[in-house]
């Protein structure tokens, strides 16, 4: 009996030891599984969180950027995801064509040489090399980052530098250097933008103080009316000169050598602008019906069947693919809600008008006339806030479309600043036209004798308007400048 009990004790000890081993192994396995699960489900992403902690970067602006996505719909978020996925796939060398890979290699070489020139103090050569690298690889994060740093520290162009940092982050969200640079520039750029808007308000108030009966103001408004129509249809490819545009509007007579459609585009804009002046400017809210009525007048002479109607087919605008026709009704309802929301009305009028322009042209609800209708809506909102209708010069067509493209890629700010530029130039022209200056004041377009007109201005005036005109060829329209008595 004692022997049997002695044999059982070692056996029980072995069983107890085995049970202990199994418990320890189970505990270790469970701990590893829990750690792995926690790492995979961390809220900010393990890689990005690790990099942020490693470099001790502040995350306030990054989190603020993420919070802004809460206002977007599911469709808009999906569009952002598609753009991000495409950007990620584009960053993989295997996805590039042979020609694109060659361009990237050349861009990297130009980038290295640009940095060498910069370190050697040869800033002009460095600037040209940076621009060359950007032209070869406009979506390469390293090119965007290094060129932005050059602009920030050497050229003192912090606004453009911030724009390139933002683009680099859109393409490579975990780029720690781009994050750090953006943290440094974001507040400064926001302050500059706010100061610009305050300056616009001051000029608007100065213009509003001029009595409506002022003869110079009345002449300026009449000239600006012709200019607005001329430039808006010109952006869309209309070849009428300013003098011909004025003739069509004043005489309703045909111009030899010009198509019927070009005449009708001008007449349609005239109808739409008269509708704005007579009705929309006084309305408290802009409805979907108002937008359709505006578009119906834009196409009233060109295509009366499609005027005021949503498109029924898919369209393609360069690299942008607008929503399908089945989504237009709900998207336009959302746009109408945004247009009249309390949040939108709290925005600065220039920001509000520029955003409305972009949102409508991004949806692209019509077969034709989307750009003209969007610009008319923008000016309606500006006029309700006391601003004059803003003229976007046809000579800046490429800039206009470039900034719209940047907005499609995720950064609306360059487009808003472009609209602010056009707003300020329009305000300046009104103020100069109603001032006591005895000289001729040119309008926004370029003419063959533009250089002579500017040379006739007093030196201190000429110095105050260095960016009145875009460089490039003139329109040859022979437009009359405003003459101030």
From Swiss-Prot:
Family from the record: Belongs to the fic family.
GO process annotations (BP): detection of light stimulus involved in visual perception; histamine transport; protein adenylylation; response to endoplasmic reticulum stress; visual behavior
Residues flagged as site, Important for autoinhibition of adenylyltransferase activity: 236
Keyword annotations from UniProtKB, A to Z: ATP-binding, Hydrolase, Membrane, Nucleotide-binding, Nucleotidyltransferase, Repeat, TPR repeat, Transferase, Transmembrane, Transmembrane helix
Gene Ontology CC terms: plasma membrane
Listed EC numbers: 2.7.7.108, 3.1.4.-
GO molecular function, one term: AMPylase activity
Domain Fido: from-to ranges: 286-421
Native source species: Drosophila virilis (Fruit fly)
Motif (Inhibitory (S/T)XXXE(G/N) motif): 232-237
Residues holding ATP: 236, 317-320, 368-375, 400-401, 408
Designated name of the protein: Protein adenylyltransferase Fic
Free-text comment on this protein's domains from its UniProt entry: The fido domain mediates the adenylyltransferase activity.
Active site positions, chain numbering: 364
InterPro entries: Fido, Fido-like_dom_sf, Fido_containing, TPR-like_helical_dom_sf, TPR_rpt
Functional summary from the UniProt entry: Protein that can both mediate the addition of adenosine 5'-monophosphate (AMP) to specific residues of target proteins (AMPylation), and the removal of the same modification from target proteins (de-AMPylation), depending on the context. The side chain of Glu-236 determines which of the two opposing activities (AMPylase or de-AMPylase) will take place. Acts as a key regulator of the unfolded protein response (UPR) by mediating AMPylation or de-AMPylation of Hsc70-3/BiP.
Summary of activators and inhibitors of this protein: The side chain of Glu-236 determines which of the two opposing activities (AMPylase or de-AMPylase) will take place. In response to endoplasmic reticulum stress, mediates de-AMPylase activity. Adenylyltransferase activity is inhibited by the inhibitory helix present at the N-terminus: Glu-236 binds ATP and competes with ATP-binding at Arg-375, thereby preventing adenylyltransferase activity. In unstressed cells, disengagement of Glu-236 promotes adenylyltransferase activity.
Subcellular location: Membrane
Domain of life per record: Eukaryota
Bilayer topology term: Single-pass membrane protein
Transmembrane feature ranges: 21-43
Repeat (TPR) residue spans along the chain: 107-140, 141-175
Catalytic activity reported: L-tyrosyl-[protein] + ATP = O-(5'-adenylyl)-L-tyrosyl-[protein] + diphosphate; L-threonyl-[protein] + ATP = 3-O-(5'-adenylyl)-L-threonyl-[protein] + diphosphate; 3-O-(5'-adenylyl)-L-threonyl-[protein] + H2O = L-threonyl-[protein] + AMP + H(+)
SUPFAM superfamilies: Fic-like, TPR-like
Assembly notes: Homodimer.
């Amino acid at each position: 009996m004692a022997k049997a009990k002695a044999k059982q004790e070692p056996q029980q000890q072995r069983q107890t030891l085995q049970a202990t081993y199994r418990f320890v192994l189970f505990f270790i396995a469970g701990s590893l599984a829990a750690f792995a699960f926690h790492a995979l489900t961390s809220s900010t992403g393990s890689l990005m969180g690790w990099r942020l902690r490693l470099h001790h970067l502040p995350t306030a602006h990054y989190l603020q950027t993420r919070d802004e996505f809460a206002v977007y719909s599911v469709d808009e978020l999906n569009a952002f995801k598609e753009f991000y996925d495409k950007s990620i796939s584009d960053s993989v060398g295997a996805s590039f064509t042979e020609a694109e890979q060659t361009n990237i290699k050349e861009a990297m070489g130009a980038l290295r040489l640009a940095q060498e020139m910069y370190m050697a103090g040869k800033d002009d050569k460095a600037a040209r090399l940076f621009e060359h690298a950007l032209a070869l690889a406009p979506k390469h994060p390293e090119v965007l980052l290094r060129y932005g740093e050059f602009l920030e520290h050497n050229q003192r162009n912090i606004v453009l530098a911030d724009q390139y940092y933002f683009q680099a982050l859109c393409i490579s969200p975990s780029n720690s250097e781009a994050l750090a640079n953006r943290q440094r520039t974001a507040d400064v750029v926001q302050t500059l933008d706010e100061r610009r808007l305050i300056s616009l308000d001051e000029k608007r108030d100065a213009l509003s103080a001029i009595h409506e009966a002022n003869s110079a103001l009345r002449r300026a408004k009449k000239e600006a009316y012709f200019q607005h129509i001329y430039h808006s249809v010109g952006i869309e490819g209309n070849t009428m000169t300013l003098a011909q545009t004025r003739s069509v509007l004043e005489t309703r007579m045909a111009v030899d050598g010009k198509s019927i459609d070009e005449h009708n585009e001008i007449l349609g804009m005239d109808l739409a602008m008269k509708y704005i002046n007579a009705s929309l400017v006084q309305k408290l809210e802009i409805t979907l019906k108002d937008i359709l009525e505006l578009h119906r007048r834009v196409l009233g002479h060109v295509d009366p069947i499609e005027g005021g109607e949503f498109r029924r087919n898919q369209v393609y605008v360069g690299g942008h693919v607008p929503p399908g026709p089945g989504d237009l009704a709900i998207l336009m309802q959302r746009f109408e809600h945004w247009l009249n929301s309390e949040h939108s009305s709290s925005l600065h009028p220039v920001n509000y008008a520029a955003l409305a322009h972009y949102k409508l042209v991004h949806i692209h609800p019509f077969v034709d006339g989307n750009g003209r209708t969007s610009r008319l809506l923008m000016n309606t909102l500006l006029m309700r806030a006391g601003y004059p209708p803003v003229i976007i010069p046809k000579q800046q067509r490429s800039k206009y479309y470039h900034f719209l493209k940047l907005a499609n890629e995720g950064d609306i700010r360059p487009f808003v600043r472009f609209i602010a530029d056009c707003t300020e130039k329009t305000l300046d022209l009104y103020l100069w036209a109603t001032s006591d200056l005895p000289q001729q004041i040119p309008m926004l377009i370029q003419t063959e004798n533009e250089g002579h007109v500017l040379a006739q201005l007093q030196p201190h005036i000429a110095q105050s308007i260095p960016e009145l005109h875009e460089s490039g060829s003139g329109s040859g329209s022979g437009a009359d400048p405003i003459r101030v008595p």
